[in-house]
Amino acid sequence: MDRKLENQKDLLNQDPKVELNSQSVAKNPLNSREVKPIQRRRPLRKNSRDKNSKPEFEERVIAIHRVVKVVKGGRRFSFSAFAVVGNKKGRVGFGHGKANEVQDAVKKAIKDAQNRLVSVPIYRKSTVPHEIAVKYLASKILIKPAPRGKGIVASNTVRAVVELAGYTDIYTKTYGSRTKINVVRATLKALLKLRTINQVAELRDLSPQQAQAQKV
């Protein structure tokens, strides 16, 4: 019993630290590799352009119609949307989309309008170069140039088209059918028939000054 107590005392008195020699260090597999410092990941920067940048093209929904189809199982509802897209710099388009949901129909209409963009002339960065009258089905529209600062004189449907096209001073008057779709198509038809002074001069084989003196 005395020997056991003495052995236990010897174990308690021993230093718990372990002495490392060169052999034990070499045998350690962790020391054979180079320990690389931990690299901290950089925080992701939020794109500041998304907040400040404006989309190049703006869109406006002209009309949304609900379509009902009668089948054997009952009625099926779908939606038809019409939208106008423009960059206010002479590019404008009109599109149509169909879907079972309103949001999907609007997205398709906007995408269709972006695929149908056309270029229209803007005189002095504000108005049309000359007066023009156009008929589309039962709708008629008259467009006249206006002095700077006058603003847009038009219905809400026509205003959506001319504003997105880039006109800021313009007179318009609609006659006949006031159906929104026909009015939009008549407006676009009129804008596409506009000609600048240089274009008229080339068609008539005149100088720009001579073409400006004549009626377009």
UniProtKB/Swiss-Prot annotation:
Keyword Ribosomal protein listed: yes
Domain called S5 DRBM: residue spans: 57-120
InterPro entries xrefs: Ribosomal_Su5_D2-typ_SF, Ribosomal_uS5, Ribosomal_uS5_bac-type, Ribosomal_uS5_C, Ribosomal_uS5_N, Ribosomal_uS5_N_CS, Ribsml_uS5_D2-typ_fold_subgr
GO biological process, one term: translation
Record keywords, A-Z: Ribonucleoprotein, Ribosomal protein, RNA-binding, rRNA-binding
GO cellular component terms, semicolon-separated: small ribosomal subunit
A Gene Ontology molecular function term of the record: structural constituent of ribosome
Biased composition (Polar residues): 20-31
SUPFAM superfamilies: dsRNA-binding domain-like, Ribosomal protein S5 domain 2-like
Highest taxon of source: Bacteria
Chain positions covered by the region annotation Disordered: 1-55
Family per record: Belongs to the universal ribosomal protein uS5 family.
UniProt remark on domains: The N-terminal domain interacts with the head of the 30S subunit; the C-terminal domain interacts with the body and contacts protein S4. The interaction surface between S4 and S5 is involved in control of translational fidelity.
Function: With S4 and S12 plays an important role in translational accuracy.
Subunit structure of this chain's protein: Part of the 30S ribosomal subunit. Contacts proteins S4 and S8.
Entry protein name: Small ribosomal subunit protein uS5
Gene symbol of the encoding locus: rpsE
